[in-house]
Regions:
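Thr-Gly-centered strand-to-loop micro-motif
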Residues: 3-4, 121
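C-terminal cap of metal-dependent C-N hydrolases
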Residues: 73-133
């Protein structure tokens, strides 16, 4: 299983003595694009990425996600591995306004669908705040 840390502390919150700094980094929005870049560079297979991020976690928690099958949520992405870009904090949506991955190569999904609804198209957020929902262990 591969997972992301996401601790969206601002630069101001991080600008303290080491023992007073909140731990973690923002990572939820950049994790998958960084791994997709690894797929393009043949460091990681696409099958291993899908099983590690989608299939295995949904199997472990017994939730209806992780695969495109009847009876599961219609969550999926559309990716073009030829569309590589550099990560820029101004293009991300986290409240913290920075990323430790600034300038790294990545491949962001062209489209993101959640429960069959298109939420992202060509890096633009179409969905409204609050569309997501918590899905706990079944």
């Amino acid at each position: 299983i591969l997972e992301s840390d996401h601790a969206p502390h601002t630069i101001e919150e991080k600008d303290k003595e080491f023992d007073a700094v909140p731990s973690g980094v923002p990572g939820v929005e950049t994790m998958f694009p960084l791994f997709l870049y690894m797929v393009k560079k043949e460091i990681l297979s696409f099958e291993r990425l899908v099983s590690s991020i989608c299939e295995n976690p949904s199997d472990l928690l017994n939730i209806p996600k992780g695969r495109i099958e009847v009876g599961r949520d219609a969550d999926f992405i559309v990716v073009d591995l030829k569309k590589e870009c550099k990560i820029k904090s101004e293009n991300l949506h986290s409240k913290c306004g920075w990323t430790p991955y600034e300038g790294r190569s990545a491949i962001f999904p062209e489209y993101v669908f959640v429960r069959g609804e298109k939420l992202i198209e060509e890096h633009e957020m179409l969905g409204s705040k609050g569309f997501g929902r918590f899905v706990g262990e079944q």
